[in-house]
Amino acid sequence: MIYGIGTDIVSLKRIVRLSKKFGQAFAERILTPEELLEFPQAGKPVNYLAKRFAAKEAFAKAVGTGIRGAVSFRNIGIGHDALGKPEFFYAPALSKWLEEQGISRVSLSMSDEEDTVLAFAVAEK
C-alpha cells in the first residue's frame, strides 16, 4: 500500500552556488560517509550532489516528515543495484524509524537534464 510520494527538482546552478559558498562543508552536510568516499571519483560532481540532494528531499516528502530527526541527509544514502537502478540505503537510526512507522520500502527514480535534476520517491507500508 502506498504511504506517500515525494518529488524534488533541483537546479544545477543552485548546487554550484552552494558548493562555491560552503565548499566541502556542503558535501559533508548532504552526503553519507559512504557517499563522501565516492564523491571525489564522480565524473560530474555537481550532478552527483544535486541528484543526492533531490533524492533525499523526495524521500523526506514521501515519508511525510521533511528533513528532521532520523530523516536526515546523513542518514539517507543513495546507491544502485546490480542493474544500475537507484535505490535508498539507510543508517541504523533511520532503519529503526522506518520500521516503527511501518514503512517497508521507499522506491526511487531520478532523471537529469542539462541544468536540472528530478527525483521521485514512493514510500510503501
UniProtKB/Swiss-Prot annotation:
InterPro entries according to UniProt: 4-PPantetheinyl_Trfase_dom, 4-PPantetheinyl_Trfase_dom_sf, ACPS, Ppantetheine-prot_Trfase_dom
Keywords assigned by UniProt, alphabetized: Cytoplasm, Fatty acid biosynthesis, Fatty acid metabolism, Lipid biosynthesis, Lipid metabolism, Magnesium, Metal-binding, Transferase
Primary localization class, coarse: cytoplasm
Class of this enzyme: transferase
A GO term for molecular function: holo-[acyl-carrier-protein] synthase activity
Keyword Amino-acid biosynthesis: no
Subcellular location: Cytoplasm
GO biological process, one term: fatty acid biosynthetic process
UniProt cross-references to HAMAP family, sorted A to Z: AcpS (MF_00101)
Cited function: Transfers the 4'-phosphopantetheine moiety from coenzyme A to a Ser of acyl-carrier-protein.
Protein name (Swiss-Prot/TrEMBL): Holo-[acyl-carrier-protein] synthase
Source organism: Neisseria meningitidis serogroup A / serotype 4A (strain DSM 15465 / Z2491)
Gene of this entry: acpS
